[in-house]
Curated annotation (Swiss-Prot):
Zn(2+) binds at residues 406, 409, 422, 428. Belongs to the NAD-dependent DNA ligase family. LigA subfamily. The keyword Metal-binding applies. The gene is ligA. One of its GO terms (biological process) is DNA repair. Its EC number is 6.5.1.2. One of its GO terms (molecular function) is DNA ligase (NAD+) activity. This is DNA ligase. Its cofactor is Mg(2+); Mn(2+). Pfam families: BRCT, DNA_ligase_aden, DNA_ligase_OB, HHH_2, HHH_5. The keyword DNA repair applies. Residues 586-662 form the BRCT domain. It catalyses: NAD(+) + (deoxyribonucleotide)n-3'-hydroxyl + 5'-phospho-(deoxyribonucleotide)m = (deoxyribonucleotide)n+m + AMP + beta-nicotinamide D-nucleotide.
Length: 662
């Protein structure tokens, strides 16, 4: 075959694989086969000197650009007017209603009833991509002033989900947002000399970096949502435009909703606010835009904003405040960790007074000092984290000092990697109290009525120094505790006795194995079925369990090597604790061994209950649709997973059809 022809075929094939992997989340080729074809293409391009502008080899270069050139957008990239209350949305909606009524009263060609399209407002860097009449990406640019941006074509090409060539023969400008996912952010920060402060700066800084290789290291993603300019036939609705974007292979977010009333808009705002911190990228609100393009054109623009769209903004999830002090606390494992005491600041609707600092290495890398202004970030409803300092605030600040002894018991501290630990396992109150509370917890041994206050008294007054000591408690001694009368003492003893009959997964979780949570405990029990089998498990056997990686496997092996661990377990068993495993019989069903994806809202099942139901039927529940998916169960407001299932020919079931099958 002619070598140029072979290059063209390889480019087409590799771009198809990239689209499947980075946009659809589904790969039809192994990494090994992809790499083989990629390097075959590299060699052919070197040999012939023939390189297509949309070849995947053109995505990443080691070039350092001398400067950014300016790019004049064909169509302006507008800012959006912003609202922070439903009342402001109502006022905007009422203006639209008034305009529509007045226009339809005086015009022969009536406008359709108002319909709004809701999409997420991404918190990254706006980009504008230009494709020529051959469908080839020719320019990537930042928003800039809205009229003129900076040419970041080389940087944009490092985003692997962005197509370098599309099936379109009209000149086109398409708008989107370059973002950094939390996974990419955490990976970059784990290796970077200077950590990034937030996801938005990670994306913006990458695209505005003249060193393209540095941009590539940040592993950016992108979502597209608007065609700014297109030669040829115009779109009639925004939904038609969004479908065009999707069919051309651009990455799009799953969330697109149609609303016609304020009540519907309010429900969507509440929904997105609830899931905001569960996303692996940042959003700062919702965009509400009129669907009908003719209505948009007639409404027009103010000097700054389009009148036909508005952004509902959420409370900020990042802020700056002053670091007042650092408090060192001892955890269940004995790890001594720093917590920042902050000048109170409002963050995502919550008053924040404390934040995570992780360890001394983290403090040094971020340059955090007492008295400095610090960047604080809140996500996933966990304790906020300090991401860095405001450099201008460092004058007159003090260094944070590492403790020399345990802040709780005064014992010697030891270093293990980047962390410090208290060695006084039995005599350090916070360690022992937290260990006992964890052991007695609802998802562990489920000792009813047990509290941290009770654990503290057991440690201080009854000299409880191990979890097995709980099963040696005596009625008369419990009466010596504060607020313990005969009834409360007996209730506690009864609850402790009842806890002896427990599931193996609850017992395993109660032991407090590092990095083993409730779900991992369940997965381990399903695989090994007995404590004895788990104790003997090899590293290879452990990592074969779903979601058990190298770190978890090593934690389990090290845990069962400890002489004290084995002594405590044997003592618990000798005291009558009886962890048992009942192998659940999986019923024969059409779902046995099948891969099932659930999308949308179901009437009779929560996400947890449908997952449990499917697993009881022998199905494997997946979070994404691919060629390997056997069934998709679609509820109300099913999103892109439904569309993808249709395009792949996957069997789609309604909730009723699913129930009829079982």
């Amino acid at each position: 075959m002619d070598k140029k022809k072979l290059i063209e075929e390889l480019v087409e094939e590799l771009n198809k694989y990239a689209y499947e992997y980075y946009v659809l989340g589904n790969s039809s080729v192994t990494d090994k086969d992809y790499d083989k074809k990629y390097y075959e293409l590299v060699d052919l391009e070197k040999e012939t000197g023939y390189k297509l502008p949309y070849s995947p080899t053109q995505r990443v270069g080691d070039v350092i650009l001398p400067e950014f050139k300016k790019y004049t957008h064909k169509a302006r990239l507008w800012s959006l007017d912003k609202a922070q209350t439903l009342e402001e949305i109502r006022e905007w909606h009422n203006r639209n209603v008034k305009f529509l009524e007045e226009y339809n009263r005086t015009s022969d060609e009536e406008l359709p009833p108002l319909k709004y399209i809701l999409t997420k407002k991404f918190d990254g860097l706006t980009i504008n991509l230009s494709y020529d009449e051959n469908g080839v990406l020719v320019t990537g640019a930042t928003r800039g002033t809205g009229a003129i941006g900076e040419d970041v074509t080389a940087q944009v090409k490092t985003i692997k989900s962005i197509p370098l060539k599309i099936d379109c023969h009209d000149f086109l400008e398409i708008h989107g947002e370059a973002i950094m996912t939390t996974e990419a952010f955490e990976k970059y920060n784990s290796e970077a000399e200077t950590p990034l402060k937030n996801l938005r700066n990670g994306a913006a800084g990458a695209l505005r970096n003249l060193n393209v290789a540095e941009t590539a290291k940040r592993n950016l993603s992108a979502f597209f949502y608007d065609v700014g300019y297109k030669e040829g036939a115009p779109f009639k609705t925004y939904m038609e435009m969004l479908n065009f974007i999707k069919t051309k292979g651009f990455p799009m977010d799953d969330y697109i909703r149609e609303c016609t009333t304020l009540d519907e808009i309010q429900k969507e705002i509440d929904y997105i606010r609830d899931i905001r911190f569960d996303l692996n990228y940042d959003i700062d609100g919702l965009v509400i835009a009129i669907d009908d393009i003719r209505t948009r054109d007639l409404l027009g623009y103010t000097v700054k904003f389009p009148k036909w769209a508005i952004a509902y903004k959420f409370e900020a999830q990042e802020a700056t405040t002053k670091l007042l002090d650092v408090e060192w606390n001892v955890g269940r494992s004995g790890r001594v960790s720093p917590t920042a005491i902050l000048e109170p600041v409002e963050l995502a609707g919550v008053t924040v007074k404390r934040a995570t600092l992780n360890n001394m290495d983290d403090i040094a890398r971020k340059g955090v000092r007492l008295g400095a202004e610090v960047f604080v970030r809140r996500s996933n409803d966990v304790i906020p984290e300090i991401m860095g300092v405001v450099p201008e605030s460092l004058e007159g600040t003090k260094e944070i000092e590492e403790p020399k002894v345990c802040p709780a018991c005064g014992a010697h501290l030891v270093h293990e990697g980047v962390h410090i630990y208290c060695e006084n396992t039995l005599g350090c109150k916070p360690q022992m109290v937290k260990t006992i509370v964890h052991f007695a917890g609802r998802e562990a041994m489920n000792i009813a009525g047990f509290s941290e206050k009770t654990a503290e008294q057991l440690f201080e007054k009854l000299d409880i120094r191990d979890i097995s000591d709980l099963y040696k408690l005596e009625y008369e001694k419990l009466l010596d505790l504060d607020k313990f009368g005969p009834k409360k003492a007996q209730n506690l003893l009864d609850a402790i006795e009842k806890s002896k009959d427990c599931t193996l997964e609850a017992f395993l979780y109660s032991l407090g194995i590092p990095n083993v949570g409730v779900k991992t405990a369940k997965d381990l029990v399903k695989r090994f079925e007995s404590l004895e089998n788990l104790e003997k498990a090899t590293f290879e056997e452990l990592v074969s369990v779903q979601d058990v990686g190298d770190i978890v496997a090593r934690s389990i092996i090290e845990f069962f090597k400890e002489e004290r661990t084995l002594k405590v377990i044997n003592e618990l068993l000798s005291l009558g604790v009886n962890p048992h495993y009942e192998k659940k019989e999986v019923l024969e069903s059409p779902f046995m061994g099948k891969t099932v994806v659930v999308t949308g809202t179901l009437e009779n099942y929560s996400r947890t209950s449908i997952k449990e139901k499917l697993e009881s039927l022998g199905a494997k529940v997946s979070g994404s649709v691919s060629k390997k998916t056997d069934f998709v169960i679609a509820g109300e407001a099913a999103g892109s997973k439904y569309d993808k299932a249709k395009s792949l020919g996957v069997t789609i079931l309604s909730e009723e059809e699913f129930e009829n099958m079982i």
